[in-house]
Each structure stands twice: as C-alpha cells, then as structure tokens.
Amino acid sequence: MNADIDLFSYLNPEKQDLSALAPKDLSREQAVIELERLAKLISHYDHLYHDKDNPAVPDSEYDALVLRNRRIEQFFPDLIRPDSPSKKVGSRPNSRLPKIAHRAAMLSLDNGFLDQDVEDFLGRVRRFFNLKENQAVICTVEPKIDGLSCSLRYEKGILTQAVTRGDGVIGEDVTPNVRVIDDIPKTLKGDNWPEIIEIRGEVYMAKSDFAALNARQTEENKKLFANPRNAAAGSLRQLDPNITARRSLRFLAHGWGEATSLPADTQYGMMKVIESYGLSVSNLLARADDIGQMLDFYQKIEAERADLDFDIDGVVYKLDQLDWQQRFGFSARAPRFALAHKFPAEKAQTTLLDIEIQVGRTGVLTPVAKLEPVTVGGVVVSSATLHNSDEIERLGVRPGDRVLVQRAGDVIPQIVENLTPDVDRPIWRFPHRCPVCDSVARREEGEVAWRCTGGLICPAQRVERLCHFVSRTAFEIEGLGKSHIESFFADKLIETPADIFRLFQKRQLLIEREGWGELSVDNLISAIDKRRKVPFDRFLFALGIRHVGAVTARDLAKSYQTWDNFKAAIDEAAHLRTILQPSSEESEEKYQKRVDKELISFFHIPNMGGKIIRSLLDFFAETHNSDVVSDLLQEVQIEPLYFELASSPLSGKIIVFTGSLQKITRDEAKRQAENLGAKVASSVSKKTNLVVAGEAAGSKLSKAKELDISIIDEDRWHRIVENDGQDSIKI
C-alpha cells in the first residue's frame, strides 16, 4: 500500500474521525476501531521505515501514534490486540543513511507525451545549431527503466562510493548496499578508464525476481511489496546490507556524471565503453537519425513492454554527439539534449464522491476530487486533481459521477473523462467565497485560478505559508509537519515564521500537549536550532513570494550572493519604479511595459521577467511582510551563497556581445558567460565591463571605444572560456 493512501478510509469505512477524542472519552466500540487503525497505521509506517528506509512521517508524529495506542490500551486492557505496537520489542531507531553532495548535479529529464513533443525537441535542436530541415539529427534511443537512480563513483577503476539521486544536489550514501549487488563490479574491467568516472544508471528489480520476493513474503506472512520499483528502492536503502543482498537487485547504466576524461565522443560510444568496463547497458540501445526512426523505436518498445522482465515507463532520446550535448547545455532541472518520451498513463474507472476546495499559500482555490479508492498502475488512488474551475466545467463532473482516472506520467492522478454525463444530477458550482475565511474569491484577468482575497487574515493561507516555510526545499525542519503546524497555529503557539524559532520558550507547554513528551519536544527544538543558519536561496524561497520558486530564488541568490546586496537592489528597484511616471499620452498597458523593460534591464537576471519582479517589489512594499522578514532575521542567520563559479574573474561582470560570431551562436556565448558567473547585457553602458566583438561589429563597438571599455575578439573569448574565465585582460 502506498504512503499516499487514505488509510483511515479503509480501516474505518463509516469515516468516524476518532483521532481528536482523548483516550478516556472513547466508547468501547470506538476504542476497538481506533486500536485497529493505530495498529495498522503504525505497522504501515514501520514497513516503510524498516523495509524501505523511507519514513513517511517525522519521528515526533510516529511517537505520538505509539503513545496514543498505549494510552487507549491502559483504559481498555482487555482490547489489546495480538498485533499491538506495544507488544513489539525495541523502538524506532534514529539512524539515517548519510547524505552526500553530488559533484555533478544529477538532474531529471524533461518529459514528452505526444509525437509532437518529439518533433518540438528536434526543432529546438535544429534552431539552436542552425540546421536545415532535412539535416540529420542523430540521437540514441533506449527504454526508460523504472528504477531508483544511482551514481557509482570509480577512482582508478575501483568503486569508492554509490549515491542515490536524492534531490539532484544531495543524495543518500548507499555504498555498502551497492557492494552486494552482483552485477555492479567492484573493479572496472580493462585499463583505459578515466582516473575518476561516475557511472549513472538505475537500480531495479526484475519482474521475475519481484514475483519470487513477494512469494517469500507470503510464505513468511510479511507484507507484500506494491511493485518492483518500490521493492528496489526499499531494498537499496536498507540500513543492513545483508537484507539488500537477499533482494536480487540489478543495475543498468545509462550515462555518467563527473569524469576526468571521456574515452569516446558520442553517447553511443560512451555506453559501449561503459559496457566494456563490466557494467550492464541496455541491449536495446540504438541510434536513430530522424523522427520516423525514433517513433518506430518508441512504438516497438511499447508493444514489447509487457514481455520485458523489467518495468519501463517510456523511451529516452539523447543527442549522440557529446560536443553537441555540451553546447546545447542544461536547464535548471534537466539536460536540454535529452527527452523522455513517456508511455500513455494507465487508467481506471471509479466514483467521484465529493469535490473539496483547498486553499494554497498564495490564496489559490484548488478543487480536489475525492474518489472511491481504486488501483491505478499499482497504486491505490483516493484523490485526484481537478486543476481549476475551467477543468471542472470542461469535464462536467459532479459528485456521484463515474469517472475515468489516470496517473499522468504515471505520477499525478487526474480525472480525464466523465463516464456518466447524461445522468440527471445537480451541477456543481465553483465557490466564489473562500471556504476557510469566507473572503471573496476573485479571478484575475488572464488567469484560470480563483484566489481568496483574504490574504494574511485567511488562516488557511497563513498555515500553508508556514508549511511552505518548513518544507524540504525551504528551511527543511524535520519533525514539524503540517498537522503540527495546524495544531500549533490553532493554539496560537506560532503565527509567523519567527515564532517557530521561539518555540523553545514554550517547551513546558509543548511537553504537556497530548502526544508529546520531553524527548519529542527536545528533538523538535534541536531540529529547529539546526536551521538557524540557512543558505540565502532557501531563505528567499521560504518566504513564499508569489512567482518566486526554487529556481528563481537560486538565480537571485547566485546573482546577489548576500541578503544585503539583494535587499539593496530591491530598494533601488522600488525607488526606480516610483520615479517612472506615466506620460499623458501613454496607455496603462504601454506604461507597464516600459516599467517592466526598465526593471528587467536593472536586475538583468536570465529568465526573470516583469511578472516576477513586480511580485518581488510588491512583497517587500507590504509593511506586514517587511515586518515578518525583519522579525525572522532576529532569529536566523542567512549564509551567503557563493557558487563554485564565483571564483571566476568574470563573476558579476557585465558582458556585451556584438557583431557576428563565427564559431558559436549568440545563445551559446551568452550561456558560456553566465556559466562563468557573468551577466550578459544587450546594450553598452558605463556599467559594461567587457565587449566581445565579432565580425561586422557596429555602433556597440564604437560606444565601447568611447567609454574605454575592454574589447576582445571571438578567439580571445574562446580562450577565456577554455580557461574557466582566467585571462590577463583587465576587466
């Protein structure tokens, strides 16, 4: 059973919410139901933790469940179950797999679901490299195996470390477990391997091995695994390598990370080299030089999917030439030179029980379909996204309808069809008032979302902002989950982010709360204290500013490096916006475009447009927000974010490219400059530090000479790039 399952609905079909009742207030019948729920829920969490090393809840929440079970048993000793958690020997250990930072980011892949997505991918390649329509674009094609991504580090041919993908930046150290996987060599074959190479691929479990494992689980009266992927993930992340060794895991290589050298100049060639080292590579790996061959491969693999002895969820295309890969580069989350062409999602029929409205941290009202539980692609689904009011109207769904549910991309459940549109039922109306604070909900022009206008008077928004603040990609405070924040907020223990860091002052009050004790409270306070120092990008993301996601926050942190620099820029931009007054002949739209253009030029951060900048300035212009941030800064210390590129002499410098570049495109040159920490401007000004002049450079070159700005040609620029920004030129 999946961690996302609504276990309460299964164990308590009448949906009596007994969790809020104190043990002494339960009737005998209620105690029976509650003890069954707790026994199965705790067993479920034990399974995720011990068998999969994948804890679904913080320690404090787990401890609260165990304590509640024990207290109910004290009031009803004759109802103690044979499978009671109180009968289990030992307690939940605190150990965790060590965390390791990837030396080269372990990124995801961009997904495509339609043939058109593949055409668009090839179109982007052709435009970037100025290729003709009929010019071949050679790609490798291979099945996308559904396993757990892992990076194997070999130094002088010897396996020294194995790390899971994690969040792409930091993964889990699973070296002891990987050493017991039979088809992962401890020493590479041959002698032509690089001094250091990280070989990346998927740890997986074959379908036949999965069936055998579940057969053993049945014989031993143990819980069955839901699917091979979950079994592989749990087996690899065991704390005891002996358990991993019994699980018949396999490894299939599909790429590499850090490498001191590459013995081939194509993706296909590199995979054959990796295969010669003794690692498994897909025997279906092939090359294709046009979209017809790529789609033929996709259709062939999809047709054979059921007969393969391992799960796959699509096909991966990669540019074959490694120099093309390097030039095409990476986005913040994925390589641009690759595309995962996913198979159609699996579908199932069920009944729509209700439509609930959730209020997000920015006030967006999101409809969520509550479903009669149904298995889709090996996972039990009881909720699905309905996106927005337009989607509900398009589908015409109402509570009681039979609907078709799919896991889009095999991940997010969504309703794709109403199977009973002609049945006479009342139309479901989207609410125009917030279901939490009753404020008016409005839909802004050009947007599909309805938003609560209550702002920070809306408890739901305040709670969601606090949840966002402590989330994994923000402050990442372990043990402070949504249920705790909701409870603490309701009792006015926390109302702002700074209050979280003052919870130690309320230690005794916390200890006296039901489900808490000295150990749980002290663990929480310790976890909070560990986050009093936070990287600049995480701090900025944690503020929950609309349109400022993790990538934008990181771009801002990379550009300004310190909070003081950033805040000074915000203040200066706010002043600039104030003095940019509209002219009498200027429409509101033209005025806004002019302001946006000035502000975009002022910040000069790639991919940061007027919408993001306006949101930033509006946030800090709000007195309440500034007060919340100032209060928070009394409790935490923001660590400057100095990227590895910050050591480049070009870091923070403003560069202008002019004229026609012969060896690379303008976009490539811009990306090279940004990778060295520089900013690229479109016009020459006193702030410009360097001008790179190609052939037929015109007025920009003349202006650079007038302002006595350093000027170099394209060849000199390439030498600078090759030397990571090092050059004798005065900038």
Swiss-Prot record:
Reactions it catalyzes: NAD(+) + (deoxyribonucleotide)n-3'-hydroxyl + 5'-phospho-(deoxyribonucleotide)m = (deoxyribonucleotide)n+m + AMP + beta-nicotinamide D-nucleotide
Entry's EC annotation: 6.5.1.2
Residues in BRCT domain copies: 645-731
Cofactor: Mg(2+); Mn(2+)
Gene Ontology MF: a single term: DNA ligase (NAD+) activity
UniProt entry keywords in alphabetical sequence: DNA damage, DNA repair, DNA replication, Ligase, Magnesium, Manganese, Metal-binding, NAD, Zinc
Example of a GO biological process term: DNA repair
Residues involved in NAD(+) binding: D59, S60, E61, Y62, D63, S108, L109, E142, R165, E202, K318, K342
Summary of the function given for this chain in its UniProt record: DNA ligase that catalyzes the formation of phosphodiester linkages between 5'-phosphoryl and 3'-hydroxyl groups in double-stranded DNA using NAD as a coenzyme and as the energy source for the reaction. It is essential for DNA replication and repair of damaged DNA.
Entry similarity comment: Belongs to the NAD-dependent DNA ligase family. LigA subfamily.
Name the UniProt record assigns to this protein: DNA ligase
Taxonomy of the source species: Bacteria, Pseudomonadati, Pseudomonadota, Alphaproteobacteria, Sphingomonadales
